[in-house]
Every structure is written in structure tokens, then in C-alpha cells.
Amino acid sequence: MARVDNYEQRFGGIGRLYTPEGLARLRQAHVCVIGIGGVGSWVVEALARSGVGQITMIDMDDICVTNINRQLPALSGNIGKLKTEVMAERVKLINPECVVNIIDDFISPDNQAEYLNRGYDYVIDAIDNVKTKAAMIAYCKRNKIKIITIGGAGGQTDPSKIQITDLSKTIQDPLLAKVRSVLRKDFNFSQNPQRKFAVDAVFSSQPLIFPKMGEGCEVSATMNCANGFGAATMITATFGFFAVSRVIDKLLK
């Protein structure tokens, strides 16, 4: 009997779900993940466990102890290490043949042309800087690069409220609302609320839960180490899994 390829042994369950032809497509796919934090780290995990053949990660942040509540690589022994490097090691344990590229930088309007023009089959945006998100989405749209954006995952407790819609239609998400505003103001996206942006967005319809007074500094719209909304793994991970599910569906169509 012929020896079954190790890749097929590891990801045969994916092939039975998405067909052998679908698995072969995933094996050839190249997906870029921007932001390897509370959402992005779970995105990378799901891509790796789905047999995606090449993953590029863009981030230069290190792991801090306050990431432990929501980020996959955040363990006691990893504090201070780069998130991308820890996740790259993990991906190789899941799929040794996966090509993992690390871009040790934060994406910005100044470098996005260099970092985004690398032949990706899909870009997954998991950052929380409004102007950077907007500029990146606009760049991808102009250059016909497939992108899905992910909204704010902080301040929520109910994963059943997470969904995907066009970026023009999200609700209860201040981050994506600000991104919409910048896209319309600075990048000539349609002002007509009935017109879609043709960009998928992951968001939650749950009203935000704000920290009680005295539980930290001023509340920011992010989930950083010092202040901002509280966050839980079952929400941040689910945001990431929704994004990967949509990306796989699009890759296989």
C-alpha cells in the first residue's frame, strides 16, 4: 500500500469537508494576516489547521502579561517574545510544510504598497488603528487585492452576536464606523448609505460593555495592555474564526 502523504494525514478531515480539490487549493493558498493579537493570533491558528500552504504575518509587537486573557501565544514562558515568532513556531508544529513569512513591522500608509503587493490570495485585517485600517482597505480595493476586515472585539461577551456583513452595513462597532467615515471622507467611498463597499467585515451586534469607573484609565477603543475595553478569548477567537471561515469559502469558490 502506498504511503499516505503526511500533509494528507494531518488535513484529511479538511479534505473530507471541503473535498480533496478544495484541500489542494488551500495547500496552494497564500494568506496575509495583519495584526497578530487577540484576534489575529486565532486567525493564524485557524489558517494553519485548515492546511493553508503559506501564511504571511505582519506585526512587530511583543507578548505582554496582560495579553494572557485573549491571545493564543500569551503564556508565561513567552512574555517578551515577538508574537510573530512564537506563532511561526506553532504553525510549523501544526503543518511543517507551511511556508511562514514574518514581516517585523507595523503596517502603515507609508509601507503598505511594499507589504501588500506580494501576491496574496487574501488579506485578513486584524488591527485596530482607524486611519491605517482605512488606508489599507482603500489600497486593497484600488489594487484588486481581496481583503476582509475585522471590527472591535472588546467589550463583548456573547459570541452568538458575531456576524459578517458588508463594511457599509455594520452596527454597534465604533471602530468600523470610524473606518467608514475615513473611507468616505479621504478615499472617495460612496456617501450613499444604500451603496455597499464590497468589503466583508466581521462585527458584533452586541451593545458594548464599558469598564466600571475605577477599573482602569480612560477607556480607549482598543484592547491594549494599559486600558481600553475588557476582552475574552471566546469573543476574540470567534471573530478570527468567522473571518477565516469566510476567507476559505471565498478561496474555494
Predicted features along the sequence, with ranges:
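Conserved N-terminal Rossmann-fold NAD(P)-binding element of oxidoreductases
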Residues: 33-35, 58
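Hydrophobic/small residue at the entry helix of a nucleotide-binding pocket
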Residues: 39-40
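Glycine-rich phosphate-binding loop and adjoining beta1-alpha1-beta2 segment
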Residues: 52, 58-95
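Short amphipathic alpha-helix with an adjacent loop that forms part of the alpha/beta core around
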Residues: 110-119
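N-terminal charged helix/coil linker that caps or initiates catalytic domains
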Residues: 1-32, 65
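Acidic/polar active-site rim loop that often engages polyanionic ligands
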Residues: 66-73, 156-166
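Glycine-rich phosphate/adenylate-binding loop
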Residues: 2-5, 118-122, 127, 132, ...
